[in-house]
């Protein structure tokens, strides 16, 4: 993240990949093995592409400095490599499958911490990357993330498509205002972490599991609805901040069509967030035996951290001017 040399940046990305692989495969299950293999092959291909792009640029410019990215083919290859590492559409196919094959805690790491290094490299090189390419990939990611999550029943896959959609918004913001993209990234990490913690607390791996979450912890389930609405970007919640500011930025830079597409894509995402909220808070499972089994799975975790993160994930809209 702090490197200015291409080789050191590549080494950092490789260490990041190799460190997460044992965490994914710690559960001895065929799905974990499959997820590990898919993750490793995808990340290795992206790292190879990044190394090739940096070597090509060094051959052309005579320097390994990250800021001296002037070779056009190298810029295109770097964009593809970082997009594959992040899971941006149309290079997103690995992300839902990998998250589905892992535990909720590991999925949290992949959806949050593992995004930091590629995003840092994208921040460092955004001036050299093609704005039209980034805008296009951002719009496609927002649409694919919203569209792909509509027919899912597994919460991990829904969170994967949610991640793809949020990354699309971040990339669009980065072409216009990197500081706004950084704010979007921070709020995304905050809201996604809180959502995963609540899913872990209610042990909800499927939408069906959410129907019995109320009996486990009524306050948690009630607050989960507010959190999901924040993830969908409804005012007056925290998640409305990045969408509002990005649409305003697009309008200020004369991109009304892009702003319209991004706003419509947010409706797709909002639909499956509403679906989760409806199932978790407004429905009750008719069979009591499933409810009884649910009580045996209460995780022994502290609620203080979750409460503080939940407050930040829902109540930051009034202090928007301080965040800019």
Predicted regions and their residues:
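Core, highly hydrophobic multi-pass alpha-helical transmembrane subunits of bioenergetic inner membranes
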Residues: 1-324
């Amino acid at each position: 993240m702090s490197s200015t040399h291409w080789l050191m940046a590549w080494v950092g990305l490789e260490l990041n990949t190799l460190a997460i692989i044992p965490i994914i495969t710690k559960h001895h299950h065929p799905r974990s093995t499959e997820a590990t293999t898919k993750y490793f092959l995808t990340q290795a291909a992206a790292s190879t592409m990044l190394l090739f792009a940096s070597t090509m640029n060094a051959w052309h410019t005579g320097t390994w400095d990250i800021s001296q990215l002037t070779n056009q083919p190298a810029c295109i290859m770097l964009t593809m490599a970082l997009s594959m590492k992040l899971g941006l559409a149309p290079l997103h196919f690995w992300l839902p499958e990998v998250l589905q094959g892992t535990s909720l805690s590991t999925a949290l790491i992949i959806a949050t911490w593992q995004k930091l290094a590629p995003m840092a490299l994208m921040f460092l090189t955004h001036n050299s990357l093609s704005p039209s390419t980034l805008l296009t990939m951002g719009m496609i990611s927002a649409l694919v993330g919203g569209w792909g999550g509509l027919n899912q029943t597994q919460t991990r896959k829904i969170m994967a498509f949610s991640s793809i959609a949020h990354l699309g918004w971040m990339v669009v913001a980065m072409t216009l205002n990197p500081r706004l993209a950084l704010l979007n990234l921070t709020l995304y990490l905050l809201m996604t972490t809180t959502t995963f913690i609540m899913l872990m607390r209610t042990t909800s791996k499927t939408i069906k599991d959410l129907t019995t979450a109320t009996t486990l912890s009524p306050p948690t389930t009630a607050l989960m609805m507010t959190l999901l609405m924040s993830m969908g970007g409804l005012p007056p919640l925290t998640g409305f901040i990045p969408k509002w500011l990005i649409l305003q930025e697009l309008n200020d830079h004369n991109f009304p069509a892009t702003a319209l597409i991004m706003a419509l894509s947010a409706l797709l995402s909002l639909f499956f967030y509403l679906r989760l909220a409806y199932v978790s808070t407004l429905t009750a499972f008719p069979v009591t035996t499933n409810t009884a089994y649910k009580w045996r799975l209460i995780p022994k975790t502290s609620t203080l951290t979750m409460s503080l993160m939940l407050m930040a994930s829902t109540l930051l809209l009034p202090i928007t001017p301080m965040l800019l």
